């Protein structure tokens, strides 16, 4: 009897997740369309914005979303004009990162200001706050154009933790010296090193 109830509960949970993944409408798109007018490959990502509070705040810049199921042209940096200093407890991971071990060739761009982070990789824009809430977390599309929602926070050791639906940890990012370490749910640890421009 318990096994029957357990299977029923699992079936309901899977059904709810499938409805959320493929039937629930995406949020209203607030992306600034100008980020797609130029090629993000043209930027020197070793020249990071000075977070001295002289420019715009994270709140003043519209949240960006992935267009459709994936972008086809690398967008310009979303937080380029933001100079809000990083919030307390937020580790500076800004830059363009290339995997040199684990998932060799893994490539992602990280932007930060205040408690806001934008990770751009594999055709997806993840724009979120690191406050540990689903409301301000990453509301994105996945590899098969599915909806998903993630709460993100920095733990006490400075690791950025992605919690899918705020239920379980799926992705981890942390700094070790000058390298950014990316670890996926499968346990594969990828060492990434900073590069200044997108590879050809």
Question: Which role fits each region the language model picked out?
Answer:
Residues 103-106, 164-168, 188:
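Solvent-exposed loop/turn segments connecting transmembrane beta-strands
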């Amino acid at each position: 009897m318990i096994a029957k109830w357990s299977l029923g509960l699992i079936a309901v949970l899977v059904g709810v997740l499938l409805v959320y993944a493929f039937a629930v409408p995406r949020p209203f798109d607030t992306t600034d369309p100008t980020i797609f007018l130029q090629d993000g490959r043209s930027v020197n990502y070793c020249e990071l914005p000075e977070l001295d509070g002289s420019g715009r705040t994270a709140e003043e810049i519209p949240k960006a979303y992935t267009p459709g199921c994936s972008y086809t042209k690398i967008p310009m940096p979303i937080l380029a004009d933001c100079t809000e200093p990083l919030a307390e407890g937020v580790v500076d991971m800004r830059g363009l990162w290339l995997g040199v071990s684990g998932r060799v060739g893994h490539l992602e761009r990280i932007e930060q200001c205040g408690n806001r982070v934008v990770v751009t990789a594999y055709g997806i824009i993840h724009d979120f706050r690191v406050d540990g809430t689903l409301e301000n977390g990453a509301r994105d599309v996945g590899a098969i154009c599915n909806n998903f929602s993630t709460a993100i926070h920095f733990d006490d050791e400075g690791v950025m933790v992605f919690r899918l639906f705020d239920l379980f940890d799926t992705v981890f990012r942390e700094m070790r010296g000058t390298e950014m370490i990316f670890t996926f749910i499968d346990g594969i640890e990828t060492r990434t090193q900073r590069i200044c421009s997108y590879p050809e």
